[in-house]
Amino acid sequence: MKIHEYQAKEILRRHKANVPFGIVIDKKENASKAHDEVTSKTGGSVVVVKAQIHAGGRGKGGGVKVTKTKEDATAAVDKILGMQLITPQTGPEGKKVLKVYLEQGIDIAKEYYLSILLDRSIRKTILMASTEGGMEIEEVAETHPEKILKIAVDPGIGLQVNQARQLAFELGLPAESHKSFQSLVMAIYDAYIKEDASLLEINPLILTKQNEIIAGDCKIDLDENALYRHADNAAFRDITEEDPLEVQASEFNLNYVKLDGNIGCMVNGAGLAMATMDIVKLAGAEPANFLDVGGGANKTTVTNGFKIILGDPNVKGIFVNIFGGIVRCDMVAEGIIEAAKAVDLKVPLVVRLQGTNSELGREVLNKSGLKITGVDDLREAASTIAKLIK
């Protein structure tokens, strides 16, 4: 689950990490009061106004402004709050800014990059750092891979202070900043583990002119499967930042991810769903979604799935690919027929049924009188739906 920067920094504060003071607002009339509170609390005059959206590259899109007066800060809030912010990560449609974060300005000497994530290939947590802070780490990896440092953390013993110290030396940090750096690294690792995060990224990690290390910006992705252990973090969910169809799918307990194609896919099982999307692309078409209905491919589930798929105006056809293990294909077929009637299906529908009672399921579809194309072979089924939408 993605969260906003101000929420990520709230998590870091729980774990005693050094982060700037800031206040989040969602009304323009609160800008002046928030500015005064930040400056009086910190004793500084510089306030950074930051758009709060679930996407990076906010500065490039005009979503981050450094201000030195109250007038400049309120003007920045007036411009940013409510704007449609377009960044390299939002796509051309952008995201509407519903909250802004007013944060104390930091006296920056140098910017670095620091993150913690899981490397599944070695089954260890990785601490990753770079001297190229403030840049997209993907760009650094492509142009200067030698500038990315990695330290693997044994999950049995966790991050050790000597590893944080090693990283400080490898980054070339001034000796006066090592204690501050080690303290922050240990704090964010503690946050990453105890909050069940899947990613914790600080970019930029700031070295101040006073040799203090501060988390200038922070991104945290939380493991949704662990939110039952963190009621406070679950409350961070902002559905206004999520795709409306994905929100609706979660209400139906469906695993749905919207994509950019035009063939809606409904499959039982995540592995088969990914294979189905691959075969659709090989057929020369593009999947419009990932949709795993799991073991509950019944009338209600299929109907809800069709509603979600058809909620995307780009969908020109639907490909249902079901393997009957526990679930019976004849029951699925009945669900498909009822669902097609319930949503008044107008687009081509190709169905592939294999497994338990698959022959009976195909017979049910053939007798339905509906325009449903049944295909046994997976490659042929993908080619069929690709041809039908042309």
Swiss-Prot record:
Subunit composition and interactions: Heterotetramer of two alpha and two beta subunits.
Catalytic activity: succinate + ATP + CoA = succinyl-CoA + ADP + phosphate; GTP + succinate + CoA = succinyl-CoA + GDP + phosphate
Name of the protein described by the UniProt record: Succinate--CoA ligase [ADP-forming] subunit beta
Cofactor mode of binding and number, as noted: Binds 1 Mg(2+) ion per subunit.
UniProt: Mg(2+) binding residues: 203, 217
MF terms (GO), sorted A to Z: ATP binding; magnesium ion binding; succinate-CoA ligase (ADP-forming) activity; succinate-CoA ligase (GDP-forming) activity
InterPro entries, sorted: ATP-grasp (IPR011761), ATP-grasp_succ-CoA_synth-type (IPR013650), ATP_grasp_subdomain_1 (IPR013815), Succ-CoA_synthase_bsu_CS (IPR017866), SUCC_ACL_C (IPR005811), Succ_CoA_ligase-like_bsu (IPR005809), Succinyl-CoA_synth-like (IPR016102)
Pathway: Carbohydrate metabolism; tricarboxylic acid cycle; succinate from succinyl-CoA (ligase route): step 1/1
